[in-house]
Amino acid sequence: GECMKRKTIDIITLGCSKNLVDSEHLMRQLEEVGFHVTHDAERPKGQIAVINTCGFIGDAKEESINMILEFAQAKEEGSLEKLYVMGCLSERYLKELAVEIPQVDKFYGKFNWRELLQDLGKAYHDELHIERTLTTPKHYAYLKISEGCDRKCSYCAIPIITGRHVSRPMEEILDEVKYLVARGVKEFQVIAQELTYYGVDLYKKQMLPELVERISDIPGVEWIRLHYAYPAHFPTDLFRVMRERDNVCKYMDIALQHISDNMLQKMRRHVTKGETYKLIEQFREEVPGIHLRTTLMVGHPGETEADFEELKEFVCKVRFDRMGAFAYSEEEGTYAAAEYEDSIPQEVKQARLDELMSIQQGISGELSAEKVGRQMKVIIDRLEGEYYIGRTEFDSPEVDPEVLIERGDKALHIGNFYHVEIVNSDDFDLFGRII
């Protein structure tokens, strides 16, 4: 018979790295059953498109909806045969979206995307469940160890979208690490909605320290970096693991949200100002050289000027190595939406956000300047114009500072580690030369 041309499927991923991991698993499955798969096309390239959406806060939802509408239009114009939508937005608003955007052939939630294979007339290959088609540079990968969150923070819709915390079995995670190492991955960004809860459901205790140790034992794992920890009931055994293991980056991404007891209580964070300061002190004492990344929130209902002053003082005092901040966005279905009035005007929220970030910008600049003259181990991510661009163990991809190294006579290899002397810095990035 006539040779069937392989159909191309575009996968478009919006939102966080946890979503990206789902897309990578789906891509591997689609390739296995004979499709040609592309990732993150700006506009439809293939015959079929799958959009993996984000449902986090206002802006992210808008971005997802705009992307769906753009592809829906392409379908109407005949340049796209099939359009499928999955992920957090459709998990949350499945019925509404189906009514609003009828051009979409089918909406899947966050967990039932495997059905897409059947709907395309193919089978889901269960034996490949740890395999992925990486969309990141091939020397690093995100490693998702659990899904969902049992915390009940006032403002957060993530538990509504993702459901209860479900840890992946440790052996399965370790198999995935070995699979990725065999394909050249050296650096693992360990991610979850909430890392510190890992293991409680499966093993009846917090198992993050043990999991990290076991990943650290696997030959070929050069860097392990931890993302999204929760401050209450922190598994302090992790300090020892970070201190003892060379391949565990001295880096912790821990969202603290606020510092005033009034706000922490209203946010239902189950932690106090005193405990927060103590945890930071413990981190710095127990893990010399640790770099802390945090995320803070301004404008949550009930935040007074005094609360905000306390938050600014906190940022000045602690001098976080990395910091992000959000203005409160009311999310339907959350405790805050039901119980509190979203009373702080948008312009006040924005002003507080700007003020906090500008304080941090100064601190970041000073901390970067302190690195000048130091020798650091750097992994090279890419070549851009006149610079090789890399990161130290204190920098996670996409969000953190980078190290820029001028192209010299000697070509550097993407994905290799080099010893670099830091020769200069600006508010954000470092400039280095190969030693």
Regions found by a protein language model. Give the residues of each.
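Terminal RNA-binding accessory module
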Residues: 336-435
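Proteins enriched for Cys/Gly/acidic motifs involved in redox and nucleic-acid/cofactor modification
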Residues: 2-198, 237, 252, 275-285, ...
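Conserved, mostly hydrophobic/aromatic
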Residues: 173, 190, 226, 254, ...
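Active-site proximal loops enriched in glycine and acidic residues that flank catalytic Cys/His/Asp
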Residues: 192, 228, 256-258, 294-298, ...
